[in-house]
Amino acid sequence: MKIKKVTETSIKDTPHRVDTRLIYDNKSAQVVHIILQPGESLKPHITPVDAFFYILEGSPTVHVGDEKQTVEVDTLVESPKDIVHLISNNSNQVARILVVKAPKPEGKARLL
């Protein structure tokens, strides 16, 4: 059994400039833990694989294509591959999001 604590995982240096930690990385999937402080946002980008966002804390706004929705804890949002998406935190509370990409992307996300 492998156990990994998010708090003991290093923060990745990404163009998004937010707290992003890769907590699972396998050829079948990739899992990223993101913390968005109030006012922070991911940059619009396109991922070459399907992904979903699971809200652990806070109430971030999820943008997928032309749609956007502010979502609550324990909500799952699907994001199909090759569609522009981003997550923003317009609230006054921290937002924590689990991002699952399957299968693991072979290339990097494309920033817009």
Give, region by region, the residue ranges found by the protein language model.
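A short, N-terminal "cap"/entry segment at the start of jelly-roll beta-barrel domains
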Residues: 1-28, 77, 108-112
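A generic "binding-loop/recognition-motif" signal
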Residues: 27, 38, 48, 67, ...
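Conserved short histidine dyad/triad with adjacent acidic residue
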Residues: 32-47
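Histidine-centered metal-chelating micro-motifs
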Residues: 41-42, 61, 77, 81-87
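Glycine- and acidic-residue-biased ligand/ion/polar-headgroup-sensing regions
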Residues: 49-60, 65
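Short acidic-glycine-tyrosine-enriched beta hairpin
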Residues: 66-81
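Ligand-binding loop in jelly-roll beta-barrel domains
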Residues: 81-106
